[in-house]
Amino acid sequence: MTKYIFITGGVVSSLGKGIAASSLAAILEARGLKVTLTKLDPYINVDPGTMSPFQHGEVFVTEDGAETDLDLGHYERFVRTTMGRANSFTTGQIYENVIRKERRGEYLGATVQVIPHITDEIKRGIRLSAEGYDVALIEIGGTVGDIESLPFLEAIRQMRVDLGEERSLFIHLTLVPYISSAGELKTKPTQHSVKELRTIGIQPDILICRSDRPIPKSECRKIALFTNVQEDAVIASVDADTIYRIPALLHEQQLDEIVVRKLRLDAGPADLSEWHRVVDALQNPERSVTVAMVGKYVNHSDAYKSLSEALVHAGIHTRTRVDIRFIESEEIEDHGTGALEGVDAILVPGGFGERGIEGKIAAVKYAREHRVPYLGICLGMQVAVIEFARNVAGLEGAHSTEFLPSSPHPVIALITEWKTEAGGIEYRSGDSDLGGTMRLGGQKCRLVPNTLAHATYGKDVITERHRHRYEFNNHYLKTLEAAGLRVSGKSLDGRLVEMVEIPEHPWFLACQFHPEFTSTPRGGHPLFSGFVRAARARSEGTSPPESGGAQP
């Protein structure tokens, strides 16, 4: 039967509950257990799909097309389980489900209330996400004390009663701040956070105490005494140089052993050799390169979280330190392309809206004319097509209908219909809702032989995740190909262009999908590894090597 680990956070937000949960899951997986993780978000949005990246960070897309919290990206990067829409739900989804049931009469005339109807729906979602696994780690978003989190905390309190101590475990993540004026670490915020949790009816079994410096044993004993937690279950989590070292650090403090003992799990010893190799590759690069990432959300690091991590993964698998130079696309519009000088490669990521679009197009032009390795992702492919159409194919005024509906040459246009993986047809128009109406999730793409794309992946058909509603306009296909653009990947039905490249360029590749969502530190991703190899070749003054696979 599935065992449940509930992870809450206190004192302040952004303590790293997702990293802590992912790291523990990685250790348990390394001990031979089948694990999954689920994120419960207290906001009323149905999903983060329409939320600003400045507020929420990136939207992570699962294989089955769910738009989710970026923590699911951490989950997939740390464990081999593929997450889906069952692994993420929000207050908005819970209330939507309950109201739908009430309208159908499923509550038989009862007064619908937070308890039991909302809490029962939360528990149903948790159990559904955990089916078939040895251990399910459930992360509760927000901070203990927030009014929004109360229904979720009440639901997991009830689950502890239902499951008992041998099938459920509470881990509470807190902050132990250092007060420089006093020269001391302060445990009082942790004590009050646990007190707040206990007033709800939850007694944590384990505390993970975040700090920017080592926490003395005396302070851990003090925390244990005032929070009613066993002393060996007070885990100090000190800031690490890389998140991929955290599984080993938590294992050294026997966090997994405490979990195995309390839940009476049948687990072997942990084999963390893969994580040791990852950290070793990060610590001992053979070369460094600088990649310019030209976007519109670069002042908020979480907006491109998976993309930044994918470049780190490529560095791991090519023994290269990848330094990312974040460049605001509006800066290029205002001050020119000087910020791109000296970089070894240029990447333009996905995005929405007209702001900064001409800066991205200018970055593509710089990469093409200066023969700098270029990788375009989603919107990065669209601006590559626009730039090529304007400046190589001579289509003056070429644009996307997303930004200029009256463009004389709409080389990028709204997808009005497409075939899903299940074989059905999806239809969209300009009047469709913004939320949940894009081409989402894993889609197959057929690669053209003898292209850079095919050499990079080393296979004929790939599956990558999508999140877009605009596409290459096939009416301009022949014109652009005649001018030298190469279409190197299409949807299986041949109707949607998925990858383009410029054969005359040392390394110029753009894709409509988001390869960063499937990159992992242990497995890498062939597209990013090929991109970083091309950056290394430029840095070393050599020709890019023949691409092929994620491994060095």
From Swiss-Prot:
Gene3D superfamilies: 3.40.50.880, P-loop containing nucleotide triphosphate hydrolases. Residues 1-265 are annotated as: Amidoligase domain. It comes from the Bacteria. Residues 290-541 form the Glutamine amidotransferase type-1 domain. Allosterically activated by GTP, when glutamine is the substrate; GTP has no effect on the reaction when ammonia is the substrate. The allosteric effector GTP functions by stabilizing the protein conformation that binds the tetrahedral intermediate(s) formed during glutamine hydrolysis. Inhibited by the product CTP, via allosteric rather than competitive inhibition. GO terms for biological process: 'de novo' CTP biosynthetic process; pyrimidine nucleobase biosynthetic process. InterPro entries: Class_I_gatase-like (IPR029062), CTP_synthase (IPR004468), CTP_synthase_N (IPR017456), GATASE (IPR017926), GATase1_CTP_Synthase (IPR033828), P-loop_NTPase (IPR027417). The active site is at C378 (nucleophile), H514, E516. It catalyses: UTP + L-glutamine + ATP + H2O = CTP + L-glutamate + ADP + phosphate + 2 H(+); L-glutamine + H2O = L-glutamate + NH4(+); UTP + NH4(+) + ATP = CTP + ADP + phosphate + 2 H(+). Pathway: Pyrimidine metabolism; CTP biosynthesis via de novo pathway; CTP from UDP: step 2/2. One of its GO terms (cellular component) is cytosol. Homotetramer. This is CTP synthase. It comes from Methylococcus capsulatus (strain ATCC 33009 / NCIMB 11132 / Bath).
